[in-house]
Design a protein with these regions (language model features):
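Conserved ABC transporter NBD signature motif
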Residues: 58-72
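Conserved ABC ATPase signature
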Residues: 126-130
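Catalytic Walker B motif of ABC-type/P-loop ATPase nucleotide-binding domains
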Residues: 151-154
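ABC transporter nucleotide-binding domain
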Residues: 171-255
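Short, charged/small-residue-rich alpha-helical element at the C-terminal edge
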Residues: 222-296
Length: 296
């Protein structure tokens, strides 16, 4: 079932167009990734979807609600790239202050969040004394305390170590499985985008491609087979005429449709090669194909 729609939303600051007529459809339980470089318009899009800023034009609906309605904000949780929590009070107070904004908070759920995000031992610490990873875990737990239908994460993994990312995403995946949580995140981390159900590639304020990760890879990414051989001419004679081949530093760089074709080809030329390496196409390949530049 569709949870959120955005129809031709735009944001203009004086003469500068930050977001240009973006359309979105988000289904319940999905993990949606906005992938793009810094300045692409990802955060501005999130800010419009969360009601932090108004659209210049276009329409946003969440379960039939408009961002100007109070009920809209009861259905969402937001974690901004830069924290908005009170640094002068404890972790526990920050979470409780958020909980008081809503009726019928489930204390068992709140305590489970605290446990799952590993916050039990730091509840009495002031927020401004925490490390970056600890702060981010508190930010996300606080945003979830009222059990929203939709969680917005703006660059959630920036500056975090691998272990902290693992804790965060392990907990979020658990909530997706048990409670049907829907997540929209902005990221320039390719690993995060790889896990999404659906990806919107954004550049210069526009959606330049949108589809499942699998389909985007099929359409834009290239699987690369690198071969070293003392008899390159014989190897070249076996290559499918539709494949792209480049000779570089004594190696053959072959773009192949999929790993099965690569395996079949390697079996044919095995006696002729001294070394090979196969690399799957990835999100960086997709972004390079679409924009001509790397995402990092």
């Amino acid at each position: 079932m569709t949870l959120l729609t955005a129809k031709s939303i735009s944001k203009t600051y004086r003469e500068k167009v930050a977001v240009n007529h973006i359309d979105l459809t988000v289904k319940e339980g999905q993990l949606i990734a906005f992938l793009g470089p810094n300045g692409a318009g990802k955060s501005t899009t999130i800010n419009m979807l969360t009601g932090l800023i108004q659209t210049t034009s276009g329409e946003i609906r969440l379960a039939g609600l408009d961002p100007k309605q109070k009920e809209y904000h009861h259905k969402i949780g937001v974690v901004f790239q830069n924290s908005v929590l009170d640094g002068q009070v404890t972790v526990q107070q920050n979470i409780q202050n958020r909980a008081r904004m809503y009726k019928n908070i489930d204390l068992d759920f709140e305590n489970q969040l605290i446990d799952d995000f590993g916050l039990t031992t730091i509840l009495d610490q002031r927020y401004d004394t925490l490390s970056g990873g600890q702060r981010r875990r508190v930010d996300i737990a606080r945003a979830l305390v009222h059990q929203p239908d939709l969680l917005f994460l703006d660059e959630p993994s920036t500056g975090l170590d691998i272990q902290t990312r693992k804790v965060i995403w392990g907990t979020l995946e658990k909530l997706r499985e048990t409670r049907g949580l829907t997540i929209i995140l902005t990221t320039h981390y390719l690993e995060e985008a790889e896990e999404a159900d659906f990806v919107y590639v954004i550049d210069h304020g526009e959606v330049i491609a949108h589809d499942t990760v699998k389909q985007l890879k099929e359409d834009y990414a290239q699987n690369l087979l690198t071969i070293e051989s003392e008899n390159k001419d014989a190897v070249l004679a076996e290559i499918d005429s539709s494949w792209s081949v480049v000779q570089e530093k004594g190696s053959l760089l072959i773009k192949v449709p999929n790993e099965h074709d690569a395996i079949d080809f390697l079996q044919r030329v095995e006696p002729m090669i001294t070394h090979f390496e196969f690399r799957h196409g990835n999100m960086d390949d997709i972004f390079m194909a679409l924009t001509g530049k790397e995402i990092r």
